[in-house]
Amino acid sequence: MLRPKAGKCLLCSFRAAQKPVSQKWPSRALSMRTRLPSRPNRMSLAGAGKVSSSPTKEGPARRKQDGPFGGMNLREAKIRGVPERPSAAQERRTSRLDHRDRDDKKDRGFHALKMQSPLAPVSYVRRTDIKGRMNEVQSFEQFALLDSVKQAIFQQALPELKEHVPTPVQRIAVPALLGDQQSRRPKSEMEQYLIAAETGSGKTLSYLIPTINAIKVAEAKDAEVKAYEKELQEEKLRQNNLTLVSPPLSNMPHPTTGRPRAIILVPTSELVTQVGTLLKLFSHTVKFKAAVISSNFSGKVIRNRLFSPSGIDILVSTPHLLSSIADSDPNILSRVTHLIIDEADSLLDRGFSPLTSAIIDRATPSLEKLVLCSATIPRSLDSFLRKRFPDINRLVTPNLHAIPRRVQLGVVDVERDPYRNNKNLACADTIWSIGKAAAEHDGPVKGLMDVKRILVFVNEREKTQEVADYLVSKGVDAIALSRDTPEQRQSEMLASFTSPAKLSVEKPVSHPGSLSDNQPNYVPFGEVAPPVKRRLPNTKVLVTTDLGSRGIDTVAVRHVILYDVPHSTIDFIHRLGRTGRMGRRGRGIVLVGKGDRRDVVKEVREGMFEGKALI
């Protein structure tokens, strides 16, 4: 039996025994309170105990009236009648809802092309503004040109046209280069222009017309030229007289001998010949001296053309040749007032940029106008111009970077039957299909059929000869053009593809490719029929690389075959730009095989159909 200790009553002993048990509960409750997460402050209402229990009054709440100091310490002006700007979170929620409601196809746009994006964009707002300015010009008569220049345009440059209407790029570039538009910079500074327009739109004429006009205007004001012409005329009068006159003691050369007024730089010798041919047409009516020099000519011919006693007004050359001449004779750039760089996207890239920039620097002291011309504005060219020429005046057309809708693009899947990844077979079959379809229709003369000129583009120059040999083995008239081809031979090859004259051959009695003309309808017993080689007489094929895709005016080409898928949209634009030139229709065919970017081809085709500018 338990007994309480002495000195303590039973009640005190019971309280002492219960005291430690009662102390366990607060510590346990404290530990549980620390384990549970605390309730955030945003979950509890401020002043919840002070909420009135009275029912709310019906009707809108009264607007809070600010006191006399309510406009102090505000970050935004609370102006009545101006809607509040939504927060960033509200804009994100709204944009997400809009994207859900849109159609997926409309929202996607170019996905595969965005991975490359080699072209500098031009806003559609600017394109629309350019369209409005273009409509103001409808004829060459509206340009402030000399009468002789206008006559040369109608009779020499564009004789085959019934209506002489300037193209979009000519409506924009010619007035600007003539000085019709007011320039913000002083006349003493060099004027800088960039002409950018789609392929086959007449860019060459857009810079030749103002340049020739400016040269003739400056020639009329040149005192040295006037004095030379006066002395020359007096010499002719003395020679016509019957009296004997002693010969002149010195034979004074022309003031422009070896010092041209305008220089046109192009990347290849083929373009040198092409631009020179157009200048020669102008020179029949507008009297000026033009010379073309390239590696196709010997040193003696180049020297005679540059330092001709009759002088030189316009020089067409390549950067390599002109740079080497300027090193030995710097005076060749001393009187240059107009410097035109055609195919600027090529001449200002890594390969040509040092030479081209050096020529620009040497000609800058006397230079009045610097004109860059290109069918595309790559990002590399755009960044170069922003650094070197930040104030350049960009003259672009609304359809820049867009392949014309008059050019149709077809796709041949080489992986399927009957080709089975044989691109050579697919290329030959495509050419045979074009030739057979053309042979079914007579040409302008009965019994004759037109010859179809076809360009085949490959990515590697080693492939050109291989594809050409295969096509020849299949009865197709094909030749290869690459850097390995001699330059004289290159000009001969391109002559038949750049000439606008139609070619025709005699139409065979049987269908092209049939065996009835070459094989008897019977074979003697025990003998084997001789092998028969089919031949397609109404086609001419040129297999080339990007050498033939820049600037060559292939007006006679209606079909372009892309043997390899181009590396970028820039190559797409230049290769497909060899057809459908100057408003004509054309057709491009892409051979898509294993490993090719089908998504890129698909988006380019959709962009062509919708008339969009590629990126």
Swiss-Prot record:
Location of the motif Q motif: 138-171
UniProt keyword terms in alphabetical order: ATP-binding, Helicase, Hydrolase, Mitochondrion, Nucleotide-binding, RNA-binding, Transit peptide
Basic and acidic residues bias (residue ranges): 90-108
Primary location recorded for the protein, binned into one broad class: mitochondrion
SMART domains: DEXDc, HELICc
EC number: 3.6.4.13
GO terms for biological process, alphabetical: maturation of LSU-rRNA from tricistronic rRNA transcript (SSU-rRNA, 5.8S rRNA, LSU-rRNA)
Record Gene3D superfamilies: P-loop containing nucleotide triphosphate hydrolases (3.40.50.300)
Residue span of region Disordered: 21-108
Chain positions recorded as ATP binding sites: A197, E198, T199, G200, S201, G202, K203, T204
Chain positions of motif DEAD box: 342-345
GO MF assignments: ATP binding; ATP hydrolysis activity; RNA binding; RNA helicase activity
Role, per record: ATP-binding RNA helicase involved in mitochondrial RNA metabolism. Required for maintenance of mitochondrial DNA.
Name of the featured protein: ATP-dependent RNA helicase mrh4, mitochondrial
Gene: mrh4
